[in-house]
Amino acid sequence: MQYTLSILVENQAGVLSKISGLFSRRGFNIDSLAVGVTQDPSVSRITIVANGDEYIVEQLEKQLNKLIPVIKVKRLNEGEFI
């Protein structure tokens, strides 16, 4: 199943590397990746689209929330994004 995760992070060097490394260590392939600043220039939004089963996605969400530069992780449902 395809999942879309929206991740708010502190806008600092190395954050994308930490997040992509987490996916890599779990053997999870990223199908699509977009990064942009938010209204607050100190915060960036990373949007990741990936395929996997429910259990793996839940584990990724938990692990992402443990990373220091991560502010918030949200799984997007159809219709919640453009």
What kind of region is each of these model predictions?
Residues 1-82:
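A conserved regulatory-domain signal marking ACT and ACT-like small-molecule sensing domains
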